[in-house]
A protein has these predicted regions:
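Extreme N-terminal starter segment of soluble prokaryotic enzymes
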Residues: 1-3
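Short polar catalytic/cofactor-binding loops
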Residues: 7-13, 40-42
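Short glycine/threonine/proline-enriched tight-turn/helix- or strand-capping micro-motif at secondary-structure
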Residues: 15-24, 94
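Glycine-rich beta-strand-centered segment in the early N-terminal region that forms part
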Residues: 26-41, 54-121
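Generic structural motif
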Residues: 98-100, 129, 135
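A structural motif shared across PLP-dependent enzymes of the aminotransferase-like
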Residues: 121-133
Length: 136
């Protein structure tokens, strides 16, 4: 099964790209649950990861592999501070909530099957997220 996940990348040309990227939905391990995401807040830390030091007034719509994307320009003076991000696609979303749709074999994971949970652990701007049961 596949799902969409929001990711952000700073390109060498000084453009930040926020895009919906298609990924595989993972199978939960022994102590994990698979959650169908129903809600995820937007926090300042999420905005920092999505846009970095980009100039928000430069935002423009684009498309990546048939999915919507947003492009923003990073001022030249800010590129040095953001250099470690260049070329790295980074999943966005610190926390979220949703319903457990699959569980590993651990009793604590099985006990959450079908329940609505809140969780943290990053990568929450997606259709599904697999997390250790301790993060619920």
């Amino acid at each position: 099964m596949r799902t969409l996940q929001m990711q952000s990348c700073l390109h060498e040309n000084g453009t930040v790209e926020c895009a919906l990227v298609e990924i595989d939905v993972p199978e939960p391990a022994h102590n994990e649950v698979l959650v169908q995401i129903e809600a995820a807040p937007i926090n300042p830390s999420d905005l920092g990861l999505m846009f970095g030091a980009a100039d928000l007034s430069s935002a423009r719509l684009a498309e990546r592999e048939g999915q919507p994307a947003l492009l923003l320009d990073v001022p030249t003076a800010a590129m040095r501070a953001m250099a470690p991000r260049i070329g790295h696609w980074m999943p966005v979303g610190n926390e979220g909530s949703g319903r457990v749709v699959a569980a590993g074999s651990h009793p604590d994971a099985e006990a959450l099957m079908g329940r609505r949970v809140g969780m943290f652990g990053g990568e929450m701007y997606a259709g599904y997220r697999c997390v250790p049961v301790e993060q619920c």
